[in-house]
Amino acid sequence: LSCKRGTCHFGRCPSHLIKGSCSGG
């Protein structure tokens, strides 16, 4: 699953979310 916009942390999802590349930055 992709991170929601505004939830990016250095281009990655927060620990409580699935790790991966965030879309939209």
Curated annotation (Swiss-Prot):
Keywords, sorted A to Z: Antibiotic, Antimicrobial, Secreted
| Subcellular location, record wording | Secreted
Q: Which domain of life is it from?
A: Eukaryota
Q: What is its main location?
A: secreted
UniProt keyword Secreted, yes or no: yes
Name one process (GO BP) from the record: defense response to bacterium
Where does it sit, as one GO cellular component term? extracellular region
Q: Does the keyword DNA repair apply?
A: no
Instruction: State its role.
Output: Bactericidal activity; inhibits Staphylococcus aureus.
Tell me the protein's name.
Answer: Antimicrobial peptide THP3
Q: Could you read off the lineage of the organism from its UniProt record?
A: Eukaryota, Metazoa, Chordata, Craniata, Vertebrata
